């Protein structure tokens, strides 16, 4: 355990303890795939739990914001502040669809998901489990 309150012998350079703590954290994070599987699982679970908790709490705020924005847009359309040219929207959507399909069909799709998942399987497994724990805690 790193003591964050230690000082550098009174020389006025506080923060050596914080520097040591940051170095310790970076040691585990930078080369995480080289660590033991249980360390990878633990780090993934920790980050997943925090992420799941904040996604659940923040998701309510985002949902409320999107809902209120949608209602305000519908009210503005109803009152005539906003007018939609549906034929122009349809034409632009067709052009966008053609453009995307031309770009996608001409290129080979690179599949990196298999190697990524197999390389980081312990971290991803811990993260997924941590997300579920974070969802249940929130």
From Swiss-Prot:
Q: Which residues cross the membrane?
A: 37-56, 61-78
- Gene Ontology BP terms: autophagy of mitochondrion; mitophagy
- Where does the record say carbohydrate is attached? 85, 111
Q: Which domain of life is it from?
A: Eukaryota
Q: Among its keywords, does the record have Glycoprotein?
A: yes
Does the keyword section mention Membrane?
yes
Tissues/organs with expression: Broadly expressed in somatic tissues. Expressed in the hermaphrodite spermatheca and male gonad. Expressed in spermatids, but not expressed in oocytes.
Its membrane topology, per UniProt?
A: Multi-pass membrane protein
Q: Where in the cell is it found?
A: Mitochondrion outer membrane
GO cellular component entries: mitochondrial outer membrane
Provide this UniProt record's keywords sorted from A to Z.
Answer: Autophagy, Glycoprotein, Membrane, Mitochondrion, Mitochondrion outer membrane, Transmembrane, Transmembrane helix
Q: Which residues form the signal peptide?
A: none
Role played: Mitophagy receptor which plays a role in paternal mitochondria degradation in embryos after the two-cell stage.
**What family does this belong to?**
Belongs to the FUN14 family.
State the protein's name. Answer: FUN14 domain-containing protein fndc-1
Its taxonomic placement starts with: Eukaryota, Metazoa, Ecdysozoa, Nematoda, Chromadorea
